[in-house]
A protein has these predicted regions:
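Phosphate/NTP-binding elements of NTP-utilizing enzymes
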Residues: 2-224
């Protein structure tokens, strides 16, 4: 087995995961190994990325558990590092959580509503859109359930993941469309409340048009 191959990484991960994953050293080794695998194999390979995300999600759950039971900041830091890695690679739930990492917990939008969104399959459906398992996702819920704000958050992530692609959003009134535009801009432009630029450090705002409610990321132009 060649060192640095996918099979080699799988073997090393298995060895770590078969040990005590409640130990900080093993969790940190897992994180560092994921970073190395990303650099050596790249996550453009779907099999590699799917495997890495599976490992990362298990590790971040263990880090969250240990942070809650021990109160140790080291576990909490690792938890967020795993989420950042996942959020940078098209994971909706992780990206939504990480966007509000720096917000006061009582002021967060997503985390307090997360279990309800999960229970009704909303986040999984958004993930299925990202994974190309769904072409259309239709959601009908009563007013005040947070669907418009969730759309703001989701679209800000989609814009970061695909900055040179066209993403169209509209509503039944110009007021709601403008609200969506303002919401996405706030998430992108407010580094105190949101961590959008930590997730997408290489994506820059190139221009906005308030009249047409358009946002250009990465590069301008009609033909991106």
């Amino acid at each position: 087995m060649q060192e640095g191959s996918f099979e080699w990484y799988q073997s090393v991960f298995k060895s770590i995961l078969d040990g005590q994953m409640d130990l900080y050293e093993n969790q940190n080794d897992t994180y560092q190994l994921l970073l190395n695998m990303k650099q050596e194999l790249t996550f453009n390979n779907k099999e590699v990325m799917d495997y890495a995300i599976k490992i990362s999600k298990y590790a971040h759950e263990m880090a969250a558990y240990m942070a809650a039971t021990t109160g140790m900041a080291e576990y909490d830091d690792l938890y967020w590092k795993f989420l950042l890695l996942e959020g940078q690679h098209y994971q909706v739930d992780s990206g939504l959580l990480y966007l509000e990492k720096n917000r006061v917990p009582s002021e967060r939008f997503y985390e307090p509503r997360r279990s309800v969104f999960m229970q009704h399959g909303i986040i999984q459906s958004l993930q299925d859109l990202m994974d190309d398992k769904l072409d259309i996702f239709a959601l009908s819920v009563p007013p005040g359930c947070g669907k418009s704000t969730l759309e703001d958050f989701f679209l800000s992530l989609v814009g970061g993941w695909f900055p040179n692609c066209f993403n169209l959003s509209s509503a039944h009134s110009s007021i709601l469309t403008r609200s969506l535009y303002d919401g996405v801009l706030e998430i992108i432009n407010d580094p105190v409340e949101y961590t959008w630029h930590e997730i997408f450090p290489n994506v820059q705002m190139q221009g906005t048009n308030a009249k047409e409610t358009t946002v250009n990321l990465e590069r301008n132009g009609r033909f991106k």
